[in-house]
């Protein structure tokens, strides 16, 4: 949805330097489409809390290697929240995992797993890997991630998931190069 909003903004604005749809209007539209859409407009590493309305940019270390694994199952944010049984601002102490100053706990994980058990399977495989620093699920799912200190620890699991899951691995700087940088596009190009 975020990519469509950006494309529509480009088409609407055309070559005009004066009649641009404002970024604030983009965010108003994004909020109406779904609680996760404004975060997708950012296209940055973010910590999102509450119902998607509290967004904070975070800096992920480039000293680590990241593995993204998606089981090719689409979960809508609305669907995951509808299966969300309890909302608590307190993270159980035994569930806290930190990477620097960033907590990796995701309160939507149980809900997403109830809809897509493959997420549990992926995380179980990741947790068993030697030298994994942390793993979890991104947002409302279904993409899972693993964080490693060394690239050589990713390659065996990459081969395991390669045939049946969409995957990516590398450092943060590599990911930034390979994905659409929506926020840069918003700031500079349109």
Regions found by a protein language model. Name each.
Residues 1-14, 138-148:
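Short, small-residue alpha-helix embedded
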Residues 10-134, 147-190:
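ATP-dependent small-molecule kinase catalytic core of the GHMP/sugar-kinase superfamily
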């Amino acid at each position: 949805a975020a990519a469509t909003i950006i494309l529509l903004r480009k088409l609407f604005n055309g070559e005009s330097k004066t009649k641009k749809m404002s970024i604030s209007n983009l965010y108003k539209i994004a909020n109406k489409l779904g609680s996760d859409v404004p975060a997708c407009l950012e296209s940055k590493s973010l910590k999102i809390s509450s119902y998607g309305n509290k967004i904070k940019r975070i800096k992920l270390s480039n000293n680590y290697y990241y593995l993204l694994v998606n089981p090719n199952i689409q979960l809508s944010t609305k669907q995951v929240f509808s299966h969300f049984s309890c909302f608590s601002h307190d993270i159980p102490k035994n569930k806290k995992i930190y990477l620097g100053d960033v907590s990796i706990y995701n309160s939507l994980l149980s809900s997403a797993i109830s809809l897509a058990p493959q997420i549990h399977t992926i995380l179980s495989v990741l947790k068993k890997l030697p030298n994994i620093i942390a793993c979890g699920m991104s947002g409302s799912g279904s993409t899972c991630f693993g964080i490693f200190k060394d690239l050589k620890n990713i390659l065996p699991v990459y081969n395991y998931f390669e045939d049946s899951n969409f995957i990516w691995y590398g450092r943060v700087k590599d990911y930034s190069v390979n994905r659409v940088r929506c926020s840069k596009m918003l700031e500079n190009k349109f």
